[in-house]
Amino acid sequence: MIKTIAPSSPILSKYVECFYIYEGKSNSAFSYVAFPHFNTGLSFFKSASVHRQNWSLQISENTDAGVHIEILGKYTTPLLLEYKGQLREISVVFKPAGLNRFFKDNYLSMAPKFSQALTNDVWGQFGESLFSSDDDINKIESFLLSQFWDNQELSNIENSLTLLENSNEQISIPEIASKVGLNLKTFQRHFQKHMGCSPVEYRRICRFRSAISNKLNSNQWKNLTELTYDEGFYDQSYLIKEFI
């Protein structure tokens, strides 16, 4: 039903976590809950309609629909995704800040909501050609490489991510700004623009993902209380309040 593929290009591997392909069959139904994540998803759909409502996405078969591109924003509330019918989805999962390397527009300007259609002429034209052959992943890789660009402003933000992601070393936001060579106000503005959330919100998402990873990878499963304190949350109610 879903096939996941790692990028073959060393350049793309730095900025893209994976690609995945979903093939829905006629009369099929599939749903899952997406929890807050530091990665960013961008999906190409064929023969599908996308409906957004109350932190949920319904993707339904629509043979009259052309190619549609959907981009997720940063969200701190779990999302329900529901798929119905025969449709095709090809997705790019970008690593933190990775999406910005392939667009001249910043992430926040493109994705201010939890999910929205991508309106970009170059990407729209590529989307129309994407489903015309079976060589879709190679097509996407070639296209992404053609769109890749460097940005010094973004480099400063990328340098801050490791410091924010380290749940064992609680460096203050002003200290992180100083370490990447920016004053606090400029750092917060650039971070919001390229990451779609504040540094504080990003750190919360990272701690939440760390808690999930800790739970899944531990040989001795920890209870919620242990996870709460291991990841720096004061109590269970605080953890639940943040993300549920």
Task: For each feature predicted by the language model, list its residue ranges.
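Alpha-helical DNA-contacting segments of helix-turn-helix folds
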Residues: 153, 191, 195-216, 242
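Membrane-associated alpha-helical segments
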Residues: 224, 240-241
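Alpha-helical bundle regulatory/interaction domains
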Residues: 1-174, 179-184, 197-198, 213-217, ...
